[in-house]
Structures are given as structure tokens and as C-alpha cells.
Amino acid sequence: MDQFECINVADAHQKLQEKEAVLVDIRDPQSFAMGHATQAFHLTNDTLGAFMRDNDFDTPVMVMCYHGNSSKGAAQYLLQQGYDVVYSIDGGFEAWQRQFPAEVAYGA
């Protein structure tokens, strides 16, 4: 895959439930602590190395941000690092929280 794909929150949720992909959240620490998808890994410059050690390049990755804009740059970056399949989640955490309020965790 040379280009990331955009995915809606319903399809992202289904991929998570079926363990077909991992979810990363690239928002700032305060926003992440105030609420994030329960299975999200908080991906930052400081946690990128650990994420890459724990997830093979053939693991599909879904990137979540605030509204679905910043995630596009991060998705492209992960492709450049060698990940085969990367998605940017349309609507970001805001859409996730609206559609799946029971699947929001709080704290770091």
C-alpha cells in the first residue's frame, strides 16, 4: 500500500472487534487522558519506538486524531516507516465518542 486509506468509525470499530487491526491515538496527552477509545495505543514521539517493536509491519494500523485531519499525516508517516496497511479514521475521536460512548476510557 503506497497510500493510506480513510475509514469511518463503524468500519474501524468492526476491525477492532475482529482483531484485524490495531488502533493508535495521536492526540496530545491531556486530550487522551480526558477520553480515548478503550483499545487505543497512545502514539507519541516518545512511544513510537515501543509501538514499532510490538507491532510488525504487516499489522494493519488505524490512526485516530481529534477530527480526522491530523491522522492523515501520521498515517502517511507510518507507511513511510514500513507499515503495509494504514488507515486514517474519518471524524477522529469526536466521531468515535458520538457513535461508541460506552467504548471510551479515561486516564492516561
Curated annotation (Swiss-Prot):
It is found in: Cytoplasm. GO terms for cellular component: cytoplasm. Gene3D superfamilies: Rhodanese-like domain. GO terms for molecular function: thiosulfate-cyanide sulfurtransferase activity. The active site is at 65 (cysteine persulfide intermediate). The keyword Transferase applies. HAMAP family: Thiosulf_sulfurtr (MF_01009). This is Thiosulfate sulfurtransferase GlpE. It comes from Escherichia coli O45:K1 (strain S88 / ExPEC).
